[in-house]
Amino acid sequence: MFVYQIRRDVQVYMDNMIVKSRRKDDHLDHLKENFNTLCSYNMKLNPSKCAFGVTIGKFLGFMVSQRDIEVNSNKIQAIMEMAPPRNIKEVQCLNGKVATLNRFILRTTNKCLPFFHTLKNSFEWTAECKQAFDDLKAYFSSPPLLSPSRPGEELFLYLAISLIVVNVSLVREEEGVQKPVYYTNRALRGAEERYPPMEKLAFALITASRKLKSYFQAHTVVILTDKPIWQAMSNPEAAGWMALWAIESSKFDVQYRPCTTIKEQVLANFIAKFTYMEG
């Protein structure tokens, strides 16, 4: 229906739609085009749920502007005002609130590991849990900003692994400055924890390509790493799942480059260092 407009000047998620324009002078033309499309399909909009000429607003629970994506202040406030959990149900509530903000949190699983441990045995709010809870609130005292990707630009991916977690940071570059686009991570389970380091890196890449599929489909994604991940995945003697991951990742325009600048190496080291420390 909006095949020509989506990702150009329209973003759609289920029944939520945004018509966006970089230049104010183009906005009326974009609106007219989209209204004509709606009319051609005899579709109507609810005026009470429409807003026009908005420079910043809430979309899918986030505050979105031309330059940044902010955490919804209401979601931050809900965490900041929470008292330390007193039982498993309250820990589950805390984990649920954090899960809605995953994309804004570097190393979410590492930060929340003490909370998960309380769910495995009889409830006990330990000193480690208290420290993690305080650290989480401190993190949100200066809400992080994410930068929306631009059509056609390269995006850069940093991978980090530990014994039990893989972490991924997707960033873009603007005027020589790298800005985060999305953070994601995944706890390793069962046999995944026993993967050799190179297989964990490959698994981190596949995890990212699945979680961030829309970015991988729309952009060239550059993996900034000094590890020979592609060679390991395409090695005929590698484990069977490595070959499958190689095939899966080949569907996207993925490139591999070493960290050549100081800022790239600093960021890569920062992510890796704290992943291992907390893992």
Question: Over which residues does each language-model region extend?
Answer:
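Retroelement reverse transcriptase polymerase core
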Residues: 1-223, 228-239, 244-245, 261-263
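C-terminal functional segments of enzyme domains
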Residues: 240, 254-257, 261-279
